[in-house]
């Protein structure tokens, strides 16, 4: 049997399919192209795909996703508040189009009106959140699907998701946030995975529109979404004895891939000396960029080739 791991995400790409269904289509194509293939499907990514990826891990933690199109993160905060006391709560978030700086999340977490976490009330609200999380004993984790911080020149308040600079800056708000988040958490029991210091300037603190910063300031942790899924899904174990990794990704373009989980998949494959083929609608990567991202081949559907046919062609090329 030739073991083929089909992993990644297909959110928003054409054909419009849930990631699990898209991976199944590719897997069926692999079987059509290689009769002795054994496809293993592994949803792996942010947003809707994250929900699919952690479906089998819900006994290990509670999971909350912050959609990137919401204007308020309050609902996510309320859901976390309801889950406090459990051993682990994970909040996934990416680069929101309209970041609320996590203030809605903070209000929802505390169960108070939005006005009670804004302006001069913010420092006291952050202190209450830290005390609440500490008393619960919960390991509160932000799965950051964007590396961008909440504050700074490369932050979610300075750059739109499409990488367009945001010219209208609310300097009063950024000043307030800079001061309120300084020297937090007060207990300093938290370590941000890639940075220590100001929690609103660290890696992924802009995730979920600023939810990452609130979690970090409350004594929680920020980890890249890819690293979290790698651990939860025991990615290395899934790749053992595999012959090929096919990674589904809607578009292979360097600016977009900077916020993807592709590097987690290709790094794990490299540890097993596995060939990796990207399956995408379109790619603008040069040969050098493909190599930098750990891709040995790319198949573009260009919306004309079905995913099943893509899987068949990849299998016939790479599983000879």
Question: In which residue ranges do the predicted regions lie?
Answer:
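N-terminal loops that bind phosphate or other acidic moieties
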Residues: 1-320
């Amino acid at each position: 049997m030739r073991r083929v791991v089909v992993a990644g995400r297909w959110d928003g790409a054409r054909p419009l399919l849930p990631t699990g269904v898209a991976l199944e289509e590719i897997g069926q194509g692999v079987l059509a192209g290689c009769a002795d293939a054994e496809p293993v499907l592994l949803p792996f990514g942010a947003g809707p795909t994250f929900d699919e990826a952690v479906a089998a891990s819900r006994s290990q933690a509670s999971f909350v996703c912050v959609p990137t199109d919401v204007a308020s993160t309050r609902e996510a905060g309320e859901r976390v508040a309801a889950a406090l006391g459990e051993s682990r709560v994970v909040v996934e978030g990416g680069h929101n189009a309209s970041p609320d700086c996590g203030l809605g999340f903070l209000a929802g977490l505390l169960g108070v009106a939005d006005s009670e976490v804004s302006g001069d009330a913010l420092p006291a609200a952050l202190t209450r959140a830290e005390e609440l999380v500490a008393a619960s004993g919960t390991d509160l984790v932000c799965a950051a699907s964007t590396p961008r911080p909440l504050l700074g020149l490369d932050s979610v308040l300075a750059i739109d998701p499409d990488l367009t600079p945001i010219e209208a800056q609310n300097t009063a708000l950024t000043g307030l946030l800079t001061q309120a988040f300084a020297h937090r958490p007060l207990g300093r029991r938290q370590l941000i995975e890639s940075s220590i210091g100001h929690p609103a300037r660290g890696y992924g603190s802009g995730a979920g529109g600023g939810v990452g910063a609130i979690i970090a300031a409350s004594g929680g942790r920020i980890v890249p979404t890819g690293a979290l899924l790698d651990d939860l899904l025991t990615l290395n174990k899934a790749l053992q004895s595999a012959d090929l990794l096919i990674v589904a990704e809607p578009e292979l373009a360097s600016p977009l891939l900077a916020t993807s989980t592709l590097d987690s998949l290709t790094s794990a494959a490299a540890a097993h000396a596995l060939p990796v083929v990207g399956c995408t609608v379109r790619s603008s990567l040069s040969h050098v960029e493909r190599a930098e991202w750990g891709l040995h081949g790319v198949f573009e559907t260009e919306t004309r080739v079905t995913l099943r046919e893509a899987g068949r062609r990849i299998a016939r090329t790479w599983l000879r």
